[in-house]
């Protein structure tokens, strides 16, 4: 009788041990899965955070803007827009070749991409902007000859938009009093916005006269 009791106790002990080992293995596997998941989530969060930082910091600032007057008969418009840009504070490098400009006026909405029209002296030639889907740029200051990439705070470039071609046929540019909104977006998604209002009066201005915007 007592021998049977001892055998039963031994079987129960072995069974309990097997169950315990199985529980330990399951817990270890679960812990490994949790660690891997946590690592993946952390890496994903870091990537998303870096992308958000890039969108905020990797962009240009518009230092100033001016236009050129187009005089056709008695009509005067602004047919070219010039923007002096530099890197925003804390920004990484920005390639103008990979930059887009969203152009929005009272009559036109377009997304402009970069068109290399510079001459041998890195001066932009707006006359070569023959389609309404492009902007161009020239170098103003570039200490390491990296243009069309802005990679130092001292770098300056001049972005040029030919509003006559952007606004389309039968126009000579943007009319007096008209507002143009420009969203300049780098490859990383960082955006600088500038809103320009054309002067109310251009009387007395001749063809190609500069005008502050």
Swiss-Prot record:
Effect of gene knockout? Cells are non-motile. Cells lacking both flgA1 and flgA2 show defects in motility, whitout affecting surface adhesion ability.
Positions annotated as propeptide: 1-10
Residues carrying sugar: 70, 115, 172
- GO terms (BP aspect): archaeal or bacterial-type flagellum-dependent cell motility
Q: What is the effect of changing residue 115 to Q?
A: Defects in flagella motility. Decreased glycosylation
**What post-translational events are described?**
Glycosylated by a pentasaccharide similar to the S-layer glycoprotein, probably comprising a hexose, 2 hexuronic acids, a methyl ester of a hexuronic acid and mannose. Glycosylation is required for biosynthesis of stable flagella.
- Molecular function terms, GO-annotated: structural molecule activity
Q: Where does this polypeptide localize?
A: Archaeal flagellum
Source domain of life = Archaea
Q: Which InterPro entries match?
A: Flagellin/pilin_N_arc, Flagellin_arc
Pfam short name (any one): Arch_flagellin
Q: What is its main location?
A: other
Enumerate the UniProt keywords alphabetically: Archaeal flagellum, Glycoprotein
Per the record, its GO cellular-component terms are: archaeal-type flagellum
Transmembrane ranges, per UniProt, are none
Q: So what does this one do?
A: Major flagellin required for motility. Not involved in PibD-dependent surface adhesion. Much more abundant in cells compared to FlgA2.
Q: Which family does it belong to?
A: Belongs to the archaeal flagellin family.
What name does the UniProt record give this protein? Flagellin A1
């Amino acid at each position: 009788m007592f021998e049977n009791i001892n055998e039963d106790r031994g079987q129960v002990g072995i069974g309990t041990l097997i169950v315990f080992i199985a529980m330990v293995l399951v817990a270890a596997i679960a812990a490994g899965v949790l660690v891997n998941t946590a690592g993946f989530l952390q890496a994903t969060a870091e990537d998303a955070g870096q992308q958000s930082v890039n969108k905020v910091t990797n962009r240009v600032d518009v230092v100033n803007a001016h236009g050129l007057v187009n005089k056709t008969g008695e009509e005067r418009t602004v047919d070219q827009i010039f923007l002096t840009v530099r890197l925003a504070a804390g920004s990484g490098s920005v390639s103008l070749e990979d930059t887009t400009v969203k152009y929005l006026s009272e009559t036109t909405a377009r997304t402009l991409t970069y068109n290399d029209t510079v001459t041998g002296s890195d001066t932009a030639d707006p006359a070569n902007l023959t389609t309404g889907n492009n902007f161009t740029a020239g170098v103003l200051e570039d200490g390491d000859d990296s243009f069309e990439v802005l990679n130092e705070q001292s770098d300056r470039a001049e972005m040029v938009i030919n509003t006559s071609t952007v606004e389309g046929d039968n126009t000579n540019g943007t009319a007096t009093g008209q507002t143009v909104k420009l969203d300049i977006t780098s490859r990383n998604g960082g955006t600088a916005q500038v809103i320009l209002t054309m002067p109310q009066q251009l009387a007395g201005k001749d063809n190609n006269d500069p005008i502050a915007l």
